[in-house]
Design a protein with these regions (language model features):
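Assembly/oligomerization scaffold segments
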Residues: 1-142
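Short beta-strand-centered interaction patches in the first periplasmic/extracellular domains
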Residues: 127-130, 134-136, 174-238
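Second-shell loop/turn segments in exported
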Residues: 141-150, 180-186
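Glycine-rich, acidic and aromatic/proline-enriched surface loops and short helix-turn segments
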Residues: 125-139, 150-173
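Short secondary-structure capping/junction motifs at helix and strand boundaries
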Residues: 94-97, 167-172, 206-211
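A generic alpha-helix structural signal
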Residues: 46, 157, 195-198
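Short, intrinsically disordered, mixed-charge
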Residues: 78-80, 158, 162, 200, ...
Length: 238
């Protein structure tokens, strides 16, 4: 996986079940939800969606390019507390690995944290870019971990991510078991920094290697050894 992997790009315009160009996607709907819970479907304002994930980033991020002839951002001002709920897939397939689910019913909506590149295209028409991130990214900026943990490092990671008073992640967390147990004091660190600290100490249960990666994909969080990322699905080294 490259440093920053672009997951999707341009919306499939003609036939939502046929791929015409690389990066095409089929978008079911896209709801912009404000802090009061009011939702507006902005699907037809969307020109482009970009979702980024990386083994070097603890959270997914993304952008939505909007062409707005409805005066949306004045009628529903962007204050940094809004959420985006959407579900998109690769045209022509319903396989789970080709679906990005950020819907309210079955997935996890993302949070808008910035609006940039606002420009007037025509009278009554403007374009701008909405920047979004996962909910945990914002909670990580607002919370700290000051606590001692004991046991295997993979259980510590699960405890840090699921702490109701901290990161409070509800997403799938896939952890590779570690063979080393320890008692560790986290000295007032942000949750992601605490997990990154554990990554440097973690030793895989089924190998002699040291060092883990912690990152988020569109399917959830991963805490796994470097060595496990260098094998194929059958466990054979590449």
């Amino acid at each position: 996986m490259p440093y920053q992997d672009l997951i999707v790009g341009h919306k499939s315009m003609k036939n939502p079940d046929v791929i015409e160009f690389a990066g095409d996607y089929s978008l079911r709907d896209m709801l912009l939800i404000n802090h009061e819970g009011e939702a507006i479907d902005i699907k037809y304002l969307v020109q482009e969606i970009n979702v980024y994930e990386s083994i070097y980033n603890n959270s997914i991020t993304g952008t939505v390019v909007i062409t707005d002839a409805t005066n949306l951002i004045n009628n529903l001002p962007i204050q940094g507390t809004e959420r985006l709920a959407f579900k998109l897939k690769t045209p022509g397939t319903d396989k789970q690995q080709h679906i990005i689910d950020c819907s309210e019913k079955t997935g996890f909506p993302v949070n808008i944290f910035k609006l940039t590149h606002r420009q007037q295209l025509d009278e009554g028409v403007q374009m701008y870019i909405l920047h979004f991130c996962s909910r945990e990214f914002l909670r990580n900026m607002r919370t700290r971990v000051s606590k001692s943990y004991s046991g295997t490092l993979d259980t510590m990671v699960n405890a840090i991510l699921g702490d109701k008073d901290g990161l409070d992640s509800r997403k799938t967390i896939t952890t590779q078991k570690t063979r080393n147990s320890d008692k560790i004091v986290i000295p007032n660190k942000r949750p992601f920094d605490a997990v990154d600290m554990l990554c440097k100490r973690a030793m895989a249960d089924n190998s002699k290697s040291v060092g883990y990666h912690f990152y988020e994909t569109t399917k959830g969080y991963q805490f796994r050894s470097w060595e496990s990322m260098c094998v194929d699905d059958k466990g054979i080294k590449r």
